[in-house]
C-alpha cells in the first residue's frame, strides 16, 4: 500500500513539474499555440475570467474579441488578435464602440486582444 502511495506522489510531482502552465492560473491558454506546441515561458496566458463583448465596426462583426490577461495583469500596447484561425495584428480606432470592458479594467485600443471566430 505504501508503494502505491509513493508512486502516486511521484507521478503527481512529475506531472506538475512537466506542466508548461503557471499553476496559479486556472485553465491557461497560449496565444501562438495554433501549432499545438506546449506553452513556454513568455507565452501569453489567458484566464477564463473575462467578459466577452462584440466589437462593432470590426472587419467581421460576428467575431468576438476578448481582452486577455498575462499573469493576472492586463497586457501591453499592441493588439494581437486571433481571427479566423490566423494570428493578426490589428490597431483599433479610438472610438467608444471599439472598446472592451472588463471587470477591473477598460481595454483600450492597442491592448492585447484574444478573439475567437464564430
UniProtKB/Swiss-Prot annotation:
Q: Which UniProt keywords apply?
A: Glycoprotein, Signal
Give the sugar-modified residues: 24
Write the signal peptide boundaries: 1-18
UniProt name for this protein: Uncharacterized protein ORF74
Amino acid at each position: 500500500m505504501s508503494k502505491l502511495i509513493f508512486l502516486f506522489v511521484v507521478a503527481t510531482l512529475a506531472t506538475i513539474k512537466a506542466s508548461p502552465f503557471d499553476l496559479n492560473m486556472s485553465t491557461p491558454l497560449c496565444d501562438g499555440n495554433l501549432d499545438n506546441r506546449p506553452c513556454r515561458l513568455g507565452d501569453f496566458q489567458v484566464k477564463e475570467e473575462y467578459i466577452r463583448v462584440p466589437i462593432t465596426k470590426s472587419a467581421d462583426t460576428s467575431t468576438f474579441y476578448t481582452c486577455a490577461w498575462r499573469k493576472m495583469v492586463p497586457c501591453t500596447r499592441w493588439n494581437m488578435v486571433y481571427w479566423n484561425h490566423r494570428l493578426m495584428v490589428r490597431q483599433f480606432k479610438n472610438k467608444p464602440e471599439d472598446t472592451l470592458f472588463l471587470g477591473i479594467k477598460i481595454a483600450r485600443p492597442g491592448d492585447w486582444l484574444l478573439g475567437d471566430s464564430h
